[in-house]
Every structure is written in structure tokens, then in C-alpha cells.
């Protein structure tokens, strides 16, 4: 067992780090909504003429799916819910800014939700890896 062969080239370790990072960071957003409510999202939905109860779906994508990603529990299924949640977030909050650059930072305005979205997409295609709770099933 060598450092380079067994550790530095371990794709499964990379998938674990991706799951922990994407799921862990999104969990903060979800817990904030869980403890303080989804009124902000409900207001955005109301302005779009949509029912406000749909805002509770963000808890599914930001709390439940994030915890599943962290644990590696049905990773592919969790990742598609997670990514779908981010598509909705981008469409609701950034649809008018898809081609905008932040003048203060020079960054793309929707870059953070896009990073979360792509993290979910990658995990959907790869699965959770060897260090996941569930492995080998269609939802894993």
C-alpha cells in the first residue's frame, strides 16, 4: 500500500469529500429554513402566482436530500432531488441574472447555486462510492 497508489488516487475518497461538502454546506441553508420558516420562498412563489405550500419542498431538497448525500444513503436518488431543488432555486431567484456578472466580485451571479447543482449532477452520475452507506442499487 503506497500513499500515491492507494490514497491519492482513490476516487471513492473524492466522492466522499464531494458528498460531505455539497450535502454539508447545503444543510446549513435547509436548517435555516427549517428553524426560521420558508416564508421568503413562499413570498417568491406567491409573486409568481404559485401556491406557497410548494416552498416546503425546499426542505426536502435542502435537509432530507443533504442528509442522505452526507450519509451516502441512496445517493443517486438523493442527488436527483438535490439537483432538482437547485434547478428550481436558479429559476426562481436567478432567472433574470443567468448572464450577469457581479460587479463587486467579477463572478457569475448564479455561480453558487450552479456549483450545488453540478455537485448533485456529478453524484447522480457517479453514485456515492465505496464509503457510502448503500452501494450497488439503482438508487445508489
Regions picked out by a protein language model, each given a short descriptive name:
Residues 1-32, 53-60, 64-140:
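Extended, low-polarity transmembrane helix blocks
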Amino acid at each position: 500500500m503506497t500513499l500515491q497508489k492507494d490514497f491519492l488516487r482513490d476516487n471513492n475518497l473524492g466522492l466522499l469529500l464531494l458528498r460531505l461538502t455539497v450535502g454539508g454546506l447545503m444543510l446549513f441553508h435547509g436548517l435555516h429554513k427549517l428553524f426560521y420558516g420558508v416564508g421568503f420562498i413562499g413570498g417568491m412563489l406567491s409573486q409568481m402566482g404559485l401556491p406557497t405550500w410548494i416552498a416546503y419542498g425546499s426542505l426536502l431538497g435542502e435537509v432530507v436530500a443533504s442528509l442522505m448525500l452526507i450519509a451516502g444513503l441512496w445517493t443517486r436518488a438523493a442527488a436527483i432531488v438535490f439537483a432538482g431543488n437547485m434547478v428550481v432555486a436558479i429559476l426562481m431567484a436567478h432567472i433574470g441574472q443567468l448572464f450577469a456578472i457581479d460587479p463587486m466580485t467579477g463572478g457569475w451571479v448564479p455561480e453558487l447555486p450552479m456549483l450545488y447543482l453540478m455537485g448533485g449532477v456529478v453524484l447522480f452520475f457517479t453514485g456515492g462510492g465505496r464509503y457510502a452507506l448503500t452501494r450497488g442499487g439503482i438508487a445508489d
